[in-house]
From Swiss-Prot:
Region called Actin-binding, residue ranges: 662-684, 764-778
Organism the protein comes from: Mus musculus
Main location: membrane
Region (Disordered), start-end ranges: 1887-1941
Note: The cardiac alpha isoform is a 'fast' ATPase myosin, while the beta isoform is a 'slow' ATPase.
Gene: Myh7b
The protein's name: Myosin-7B
GO cellular component annotations of the record: cardiac myofibril; membrane; myosin complex; myosin filament
Record's compositionally biased regions (Basic and acidic residues): 1930-1941
Length: 1941
């Protein structure tokens, strides 16, 4: 676990302390009564069950004392308190919505915003700053496993980073969630983490290479600062988020081969352009507007001509202008700083700001409408002048382009006037396009900076895209955003649910597929598929007159009521904006408004202004529009690159571009390993610490959090390759996988996991991987860490022990030296006052004074030698200095080499990884091949058993095939008869159609014939359907027979193919095994070599780092030490000279005293003896002193030699410096100790000399006492020497015992570590149990401690005994193995004969066992089924087991107490047993030595056996010579065998060629069949479509005929009515004179209108375009007629006053006129409809003709293919004949071989009888050859049988091809019949069409005839009028005279 102190002040926000967790986990709890119940406010509340369920309902009491009655199904179980505040919700006991919500609520209340949820991380927006993103937190999470550290976004990022390095695979992090959930903040934290972690350890020199510009920062800083720059231009305030990303981005952070940061790039998606010019209330525009207007940089206001009030500018003041807790001025400084870090130049920054400022002025441009015109003009030019100035264009040109754009009409350009609305729209479109292009340029410029050109190998992509949005007004942008989130959610579902479970199936895991019901494909299809929302939108954008209403109508027509995800808007009075449709997304139902969607999708621009921008003096603006391709182009600008204009670029819409970018994004994501972070919105008010339970639950359901936890719990989220698992976790139990034998990786994994004390139901084995439940891999990692810690601890203990033992030895030496000094001082103090000693001290220097000169001369000579040696040492020192210089140079060279090696290290690591992967793959392939080899061997055995059965079945199948052929012939005849009937019926149908056409000339006859034809047609269709059913039934039977035949063919083909495959696979397997073995050896050697090289390099690096720096210092220290030793040596020599001089003086004085005593005569014999002894002692001391001097000189010389040797070795090899240094230090310490001892002895002697001189001069009279004390001193010295020798021997013995004890301790420590490991496992289990038994925790821990101590002792003792026993048994086993091996070799050859005989019997038995095995397999499957059922029942019993586990804990506790008492009693016994075991170990050691001796004797015996074997081989060769006569026949047989093998190989080659040709023909035939079936299906489909079209046409024609007939009847009635009116008008001629004149004018106008209509009909036939214009003219003429009718009505109204008598007649005439107009309009519409139908029929006729031609072409191609198939079949028949001849030849050869075999068997029997005299071994050899020949004969027979099978297969294939050819011919005939039928139908339709035209012309003639009659009536009326006028004139003339009279 992580040390929380590393996190500092952030610890409390990530993980609670131990005390706090104990308070939460130890709350009293009743698991049976505590539940969750639904609540209206908090979604779920805690409650206690009061009464049990009655009638499905339960009474509960909540925490606030409310009593509720709820249904039992509404309750959800509650987890124990120990599961509160869980960091991973997948670990919950009861996984439900209430538990997840409660856990998130508890953690959020403590500001722990991150929580794991299975395989992904959930984060809740805190709406406040938390100190969890500091540098200390980043450092703490680096390199931590997920199970160690608390949940955090850094943990997910670090996991992705480590997965990238470990798996060598690209990673991605998908940070998703609704808008305002905190995605952008988490994205910034992830990028910050990667930038810091990937750059840790870089020195200043390395960071210098990441500088982008002179003023820019490092790559890490640039990546981090890219966010503020993009947020300023792409983020804005929305209703739910103050810093909402209004664009999507996918940031790829690239890393080098070693994980170092290399570069980065950014892809942006769908910037919300509408926000540039429009904001909803409560929202704000992009941040950069308000940053510029903040006034933080006054120079910007001056440069951009802007004020500081946002409300002065229309584009940014439609919503709010400020955001709480956001300082726009500080944000401007941060943005400017970020652009500096990113390397933006001053000109580039100014250009960006100028464009933004120009857009603000752009929005203030005002326009007004000219008086009396619809054209707009500028209402002031101040804003336009400012915008033009900032954009670097002319203000006049800009206004002219906006007000009078040039439009292309044909090949010319026309200046067009614009209305105010059009100008305002064009200004907004230009502003949006300019801002969008500026943003994309900004992203590309940032990518240019982040591209460092460093080598990059992997990347981690971070996706931050706009979250799901449900606003009050949802437009086109929201649809695109929500569609993107829908795709991402489906990707998450596929990765989490579908792909995960498919992986289980591929690996063979026992898994039942779980459908979690989150398929979002219907919604995605609704949006993106053809005829989807976007498709319809793009289609509408193609039509010029399309509108929002037409778009909405098409949406309703295609999806309303048809798609469950498309709904019509529900009425809602609260809704402020109108919604046109609703879409059911995964996050909810979203209403959309389609206002302006067509314009947004087309995104048109004013193409007159764009060239002005392209010529702008602002280079950035000109660059933005440099690659503009058309008015609808949405291609992003690419600065500096001239791209070719694509033809379709101008037609690409926003939706198309968005779909392309989204598909690219999904492709990138699918190529990575994703890591998901789900962001949650806690509440909609942005209040910190408040959680809306219903809102959170909705997001949890939609985001798949609950389903993710469930599948994580039920599935296996962790998996490893077997080789990787073996390599990584073998350390957990090395003994489970022996080193001396090969063990497959899977078997090794099974053994390793089986040997561990873990839950074995938590993992499963797949084909190539081992799968783990959630949490188990973390447990294994903890066990591995513990094991490594123990190993390292043991290694450290050994090292520390060694160092302490050395220190202890040094301390012992110092103690012995102190003891010696103390003893000498005590002895000296004891004798210094003795008179004789005083005399001795005086006399000693006087002795042997004569030798002082000689010694002085020797010392001088020695001094000269030492000076020479000093000169030599000085020369050597100079050599060492030179060597040091060379070593320094070599060190520099090595540093350069090291740098080169570091440069190549990445490649070496990559090659190593590739080699390891290839090794793993090869091992898996070897395993697979070995398994396949075993399977193939079993299959071979089965095939051998089934061979005879198949031969019998072949004969039966031949009979069946003959029967089937007869049946097929019958079916073919029936089929031919059926086709003839169908053809006859078709002809009859054609005749009936002709009859129907003839009967249509008259009305009554037409109706009757039509009804009869319909009845006959229905009957014929019934008959045809019956015949079709019979045909289908027959075809089904034929298909069944073909299927059965095909199955037999496939079975045989599979058998043959399997055999060939087995033979080839066997060879390939053998070759692959050998190649794999060689490759493996080579790889192992390379790996060893690389490992050794790497270790040498590491050693060199370490040695250079540790020794190279100290080299000069060490040499100087050695030189100084040598000089010190020289000085000490000189001082010691001088001291020794003084001592010798004093000794000589003492000796002289002693001699003088002795002479005086002799002269005095007082000397006794005892005194003389004492003097002799003293002289002898003095001589001994002198010799010891000389020996010490010589030893010291030798030591000094050795020191010099070692120093010289060490310097030489240092110059030769740098790697041995450390060992030499240690050795020198050891020797130096020993020398120092010796020098110290000598110095101490010299000082002792000097003090003794001085005291002796003093005593000799002072106490000469006490000579006798001195002699006695000298004797005592001599005795004490002898005792000291003996004691010293005894101590040395004891020291050696103690050292030996110490080494034995150390070896014993090491053995016991090994046992102790293994015991500690098992005890650690027990401790972990007890800790888990102690969590469940909280009250017993402390007691169990105390008992465990005591148990651990006793268990360690017991394990140590038992491990030592087991180790010794294992060694003994291993030695015995080796001896037995060698003995049995060589005994088995002697009898092996005799057993081979018996084994060969047994094999023949075993083959039959194996064939029987194969059948039994199949039956057993079925029974085992049934048992497995039962076992699974029992396991499912066992799962229900786990709760009872858990409860019983508590009782077991109590029992364990009592048992442990008893075990403790027993351990205490057994401790002493174990101690005694340990001593006995040690003695036994010594005995076993001797036994082991004896066994080794016996092993060597066995090896000698082996050599003897080899020599005997060689002799036996020579005897066998002699016997072989003796039976050479019989060998000739064998040679002949071998020659025949070789000949047969040659023929066999030829036949095999021919057979393979035939098989290849056959397979080729099979593929061709299958392809032809497939093409024919496709053609047939296409023709059938087209026939069905044409039948349906013909039926519709027939109905339309019928309706047209009926309508024409009705119009004719109406015309007839109108004519009769006209005649009647004509007569009436003639009768009332005098009353209607004025009315007749008006009627005449009206008739003339109607006649003119009729002529115009006829002209229009002719013009409509000319072309479709002219028809539209004529239709417009007709409408105008109709309006004119209506106006004229109104005038006529007015005139008639005037006449009403004058002509009251003609009122009724006028009305009748007006009604007649209206009826005539209606009839004319009706006739016109009917004629128009007939012409349209005619054109449509002509088009259909052309299509049918084309299709008929295509069918004919396909028929011709099919005939050619059939002919080719016939020729191929003929060729195959010839090949079959050849194969039959070959088969006959093989049969004859077989008989010949059988005869030869019989003869050879006879000869063999004779040879056997003759060879019996030669010995048993020769017989065995011949029998082996006979067996080989028999095997070869069997192989030849098998091959012959296979050849026969191939011949039969070819015969069957030829028959199949013939049959298939016949089928193809029949199909072609049927197709020809269908084509003929179609042609006949086309002809009938043509006839019907001609008849309809004829009828129309007849009606037109009738109409013309009626018109002529009307004209005649009008002429007669005119004549009558003239006559009436004449009569009136006459009457007036007649009346005039009368008046005069």
């Amino acid at each position: 676990m992580m040390d929380m102190s590393e996190l500092g002040e952030s610890a409390c926000y990530l993980r609670q302390g131990y005390q706090e967790m104990m308070k939460v986990h130890t709350v009293p709890w009743d698991g049976k009564k505590r539940v969750w119940v639904p609540d209206e406010q908090d979604a779920y509340v805690e409650a206690e069950v009061k009464t049990e369920a009655t009638g499905g309902k339960v009474t509960v009491e909540t925490k606030d004392q409310k009593v509720l009655t709820v249904r039992e199904t509404e309750m959800q179980p509650m987890n124990p308190p120990r599961f509160d505040l869980l960091e991973d919700m997948a670990m919950m006991t009861h996984l439900n919505e209430a538990a997840v919500l409660h856990n998130l609520r508890q953690r959020y209340a403590r500001w722990m915003i991150y929580t794991y949820s299975g395989l992904f991380c959930v984060t809740i927006n805190p709406y406040k700053w938390l100190p969890v993103y500091t540098a200390a937190v980043v450092a703490a999470y680096k390199g931590k496993r997920r199970s160690e550290a608390p949940p955090h976004i850094y943990a997910v990022a670090d996991n992705a980073y480590n997965d990238m390095l470990r798996n060598r695979e690209n990673q991605s992090m998908l940070i998703t969630g609704e808008s305002g959930a905190g995605k952008t903040v988490n994205t910034k934290r992830v990028i910050q983490y990667f930038a810091i972690v990937a750059a840790l350890g870089d020195g200043p020199g390395k960071k210098a290479q990441f500088l982008a510009t002179k003023t820019g920062g490092t790559l890490e800083d640039q990546i981090i600062e890219a966010n503020p720059a993009m947020e300023a231009f792409g983020n804005a305030k929305t209703l739910r988020n103050d810093n909402s990303s209004r664009f999507g981005k996918f940031i790829r952070i690239h890393f080098g081969p070693t994980g170092k940061l290399a570069s980065a790039d950014i892809d942006s998606y769908l910037l919300e352009k509408s926000r540039v010019i429009f904001q909803l209330p409560g929202e704000r525009g992009y941040h950069v507007y308000y940053q510029i207007l903040s006034g933080k940089k006054p120079e910007l206001q001056d440069m951009l001509l802007l004020s500081m009030n946002p409300y002065d500018y229309h584009f940014c003041s439609q919503g709010v202008t400020t955001v709480d807790n956001m300082d726009d001025g500080e944000e401007l400084i941060a943005t400017d700083h970020a652009m500096d870090i990113l390397g933006f130049s001053v000109d580039e920054k100014c250009a960006c700001y100028k464009i933004v400022g120009a857009l603000l002025h752009f929005g203030n441009m005002k326009f007004k409408q000219k008086q009396r015109e619809e054209q707009a003009e500028a209402d002031g030019t101040e804003s336009a002048d400012k915008a033009a100035y900032l954009m670097g264009v002319s203000s006049g040109d800009l206004l002219k382009g906006l007000l009078h754009p040039r439009v292309r009409v044909g090949n010319e350009y026309v200046t067009k006037g614009q209305s105010v609305e059009q100008v305002v729209f064009a200004v907004g479109a230009l502003a949006k396009a300019t801002y969008d292009r500026l943003f994309r340029w900004l992203v590309s410029r940032i990518n240019q900076t982040l591209d460092t050109k460093l080598p990059r190998q992997f990347f981690i992509g971070v996706l931050d895209i706009a979250g799901f949005e449900i606003f009050e007004f949802n437009s086109f942008e929201q649809l695109c955003i929500n569609f993107t989130n829908e795709k991402l959610q489906q990707f998450f579902n596929q990765h989490m649910f579908v792909l995960e479970q498919e992986e289980y199936k591929r690996e063979g895991i026992d898994w039942v597929f779980i459908d979690f019901g989150l398929d979002l494909q219907p919604c995605i299809d609704l949006i993106e598929k053809p005829l989807g929302i976007l498709s319809i939108l793009e289609e509408e954008c193609m039509f010029p007159k399309a509108s929002d209403a037409s778009f909405r109508a098409k949406l309703y027509d295609n999806h309303s009521g048809k798609s469950p995800n498309f709904q019509q808007p529900r009425p809602d009075k609260k809704r402020k904006y109108q919604a046109h449709f609703e879409v059911v997304h995964y996050a909810g139902v979203v209403p959309y408004s389609i206002v302006g969607w067509l314009e947004k999708n087309k995104d048109p621009l004013n193409e007159t202004v764009v060239p002005i921008f392209q010529k702008s003096q602002n280079r950035l603006l000109a660059t933005l529009y440099e690659n503009y391709a058309g008015s609808c182009s949405t291609e992003p600008p690419k600065s500096g690159v001239k791209e070719k204009r694509k033809k379709a670029a101008s037609f690409q819409t926003v939706s198309q571009l968005h779909k392309e970018n989204l598909n690219k994004l999904m492709t990138n994501l699918r190529a990575t390993q994703p890591h998901f972070v789900r962001c949650i919105v806690p509440n909609e008010n942005k209040t910190p610490g408040v959680m809306d339970s219903f809102l959170v639950l909705h997001q949890l359901r939609c985001n798949g959090v609950l389903e993710g936890i469930r599948i994580c719990r039920q599935g296996f989220p962790n998996r490893l390759l077997y080789a990787d698992f073996r390599q990584r976790y073998r350390i957990l139990n090395p003994s489970a996988i022996p080193d001396d034998t090969f063990v497959d990786s899977r078997k090794a994994t099974e053994k390793l996991l089986g040997s561990l004390d873990i839950d074995h139901t938590q993992y499963q084995f797949g084909h190539t991987k081992v799968f783990f439940k959630a949490g188990l891999l973390g447990i294994l990692e903890e066990l591995r860490d513990q094991r490594l810690a123990k190993v390292l601890t043991l290694l450290q203990a050994r090292s520390r022990g060694r160092l302490m033992r050395l220190e202890y030895q040094r301390m012992l030496g110092g103690r012995d030296a102190l003891f010696t000094i103390q003893w000498n001082i005590r002895a000296f103090n004891a004798v210094k006052n003795w008179s004789w000693m005083k005399l001795f001290f005086k006399m000693k220097p006087l002795l042997r004074s004569a030798q002082a000169e000689e010694e002085l001369a020797a010392l001088r000579a020695e001094l000269r030698g030492l000076r020479g040696a000093l000169a030599t040492a000085e020369a050597k020192r100079q050599e060492l200095e030179e060597t040091q210089v060379s070593v320094t140079q070599e060190k520099n060279d090595l540093a350069l080499q090291l740098q080169a090696e570091q440069d190549n290290l990445a490649d070496a690591e990559e090659r190593c990884h590739l080699l390891i992967k290839s090794k793993v793959q090869l091992e898996a392939k070897v395993k697979e091949l070995s398994e396949r080899l075993e399977d193939e061997e079993e299959v071979n055995a089965d095939l051998a058993a089934r061979r005879r059965k198949l031969e019998d079945e072949c004969t039966e199948l031949k009979k069946d095939i003959d029967d089937l052929e007869l049946t097929l012939a019958k079916a073919e005849k029936e089929k031919q008869a059926t086709e003839n009937k169908v053809k006859n019926l078709t002809e009859e149908m054609a005749a009936l159609d002709e009859a129907v056409v003839r009967l249509t000339k008259e009305k009554k006859a037409l109706q009757e014939a039509h009804q009869q034809a319909l009845g006959d047609l229905q009957a014929e269709e019934d008959r045809v359907s019956a015949l079709a059913k019979a045909k289908i039934r027959l075809e089904q039977q034929v298909e069944d027979l073909e299927c059965s035949l095909e199955q037999e063919k496939k079975l045989r083909m599979d058998t043959e193919r399997a055999k060939r495959k087995l033979e080839g696979d066997l060879k390939l397997t053998q070759e692959t095994v050998t190649d794999t073995t060689q490759d493996k050896q080579q790889l192992e050697e390379k790996l060893k070599k690389k490992d050794s090289e790497l270790s040498q390099l590491n050693l060199r690096v370490e040695d250079e780092q540790l020794v190279g720096v100290q080299l000069q210092k060490k040499i100087k220290e050695l030189q100084a030490r040598a000089e010190e030793l020289e000085e000490e040596l000189e001082a010691e020599r001088a001291a020794r000279a003084r001592v010798e001089k004093q000794r000589a003086e003492a000796a002289r004085e002693l001699e003088e005293l002795s002479e005086r005593l002799e002269e005095a005569g007082g000397a006794s014999a005892g005194q003389r003896e004492g003097c002799r002894k003293r002289e002898a002692e003095l001589g001994r001391l002198r010799r010891e002193l000389e020996e010490a001097v010589l030893r010291h000189e030798a030591t000094v010389a050795a020191l010099r030699r070692k120093q010289a040797d060490s310097a030489a070795e240092l110059s030769e090899q740098v790697d041995s410096l450390q060992r030499i240094r240690q050795k020198l230090e050891k020797e130096k310490s020993e020398l120092r100790m010796e020098v110290d001892d000598l110095g101490a002895s010299v000082e002792t002697l000097a003090r003794g000399k001085a005291s002796a001189e003093k005593l000799c001069r002072t106490y000469e009279d006490q000579l006798s006492e001195a002699k006695i004390k000298v004797e005592e001193l001599q005795r004490q010295l002898a005792d000291a020497s003996t004691q010293r020798g005894r101590l040395q021997t004891e020291n050696g013995e103690l050292g030996r015992l110490l080494e034995e004890k150390e070896s014993m301790i090491s053995q016991l420590s090994r046992g102790k570590t293994s015991a500690a490991q098992s005890l650690e496992e027990l401790r972990r289990q007890l800790e888990e149990e102690s969590k469940a038994k909280g009250a017993l925790a402390h007691a169990v821990q105390a008992l465990r401690h005591d148990c651990d101590l006793l268990r360690e002792q017991h394990e140590e003792e038992s491990e030592a005994q087991a180790e010794l026993q294992r060694l003994l048994s291993k030695a015995n086993a080796e001896v037995a193995q060698w003995r049995s091996k060589y005994e088995a070799d002697a009898i092996q050859r005799t057993e081979e004969l018996e084994e060969a005989k047994k094999k023949l019997a075993l083959r039959l038995q194996e064939a029987e066992e194969g059948v039994e095995a199949a039956n057993a397999k079925c029974s085992s499957l049934e048992k497995a089924k039962l076992r699974l059922q029992t396991e499912s029942e066992d799962v229900t019993l786990e709760l009872e087991r858990a409860t019983s586990a508590a009782a077991a804990l109590d029992k364990k506790q009592r048992h442990l107490e008893r075990a403790l008492e027993e351990r205490r009693r057994q401790e002493e016994e174990m101690q005694r047993e340990l001593e006995a075991a040690q003695r036994e170990a010594r005995g076993l050691g001797t036994e082991l030595f004896r066994l080794r001796h016996s092993h060597e004797e066995a090896l000698e015996a082996l050599e003897t056996l080899k020599r005997e074997n060689k002799n036996l081989q020579e005897e066998i060769s002699d016997l072989t010579d003796q039976v050479s006569l019989s060998g000739k026949s064998i040679q002949e047989l071998e020659k025949a065998k070789k000949a047969l093998e040659g023929e066999k190989s030829e036949l095999q080659a021919a057979l393979e060629e035939a098989e290849g040709a056959l397979e080729l023909e099979e593929t061709k035939t299958l392809r032809i069949q497939l093409e024919l079936s496709q053609v047939k299906a296409e023709v059938d489909r087209k026939l069905a479509e044409k039948d349906e079209e013909c039926t519709n046409l027939r109905r339309n024609h019928q309706r047209a005929v009926e309508s024409l007939q009705a119009s004719l009847d109406a015309e007839t009635r109108a004519r009769n009515e006209a005649l009647r009116l004509k007569k009436k008008m003639e009768g009332d001629l005098n009353d209607l004179e004025l009315q007749l004149g008006h009627a005449t004018r009206q008739a003339m106008e109607a006649q003119a209108a009729t002529r115009l209509l006829q002209a229009q009909l002719k013009e409509e036939q000319a072309g479709r375009d002219e028809e539209q214009r004529l239709a417009a003219e007709l409408r105008e003429q109709g309006q004119a007629l209506e106006r004229r009718a109104a005038l006529l009505a007015a005139e008639l109204e005037e006449l009403r006053a004058a002509l009251e008598q003609g009122e009724r007649s006028r009305r009748l005439a007006e009604q007649e006129l209206l009826e005539a107009t209606e009839r004319l309009n009706l006739l016109h519409s009917q004629n128009t409809g007939l012409l349209n139908q005619k054109k449509k029929l002509e088009v259909d006729l052309a299509q049918l003709s084309g299709e008929v031609e295509e069918a004919a072409q396909e028929r011709r191609e099919a005939e050619e293919k059939a002919k080719k198939a016939i020729t191929d079949a003929a060729m195959m028949a010839e090949e079959l004949k050849k194969e039959q001849d070959t088969s006959a030849h093989l049969e004859r050869m077989k008989k010949t071989l059988e005869q030869t075999v019989r003869e050879l068997q006879a000869r063999l029997e004779e040879a056997e009888q003759a060879a019996l005299r030669g010995g048993k071994k020769q017989v065995q050899k011949l029998e082996a050859k006979v067996r080989e020949l028999e095997a070869e004969l069997d192989a030849e027979q098998k091959k012959h049988a296979e050849a026969l099978k191939g011949v039969r297969k070819h015969e069957r294939r030829v028959k199949e091809l013939v049959y298939q050819t016949e089928e193809d011919r029949k199909n072609l005939a049927r197709m020809q019949d269908l084509v003929d039928k179609l042609q006949s139908k086309v002809k009938s339709y043509k006839r019907q069409f001609e008849e309809a035209e004829q009828q129309a012309s007849t009606n037109l003639a009738k109409y013309r005839k009626a018109q002529h009659e009307l004209d005649d009536a009008e002429e007669r009326a005119d004549m009558a009028e003239t006559q009436a006028n004449k009569l009136r004139a006459r009457s007036r003339d007649a009346l005039g005279p009368k008046h005069k009279e």
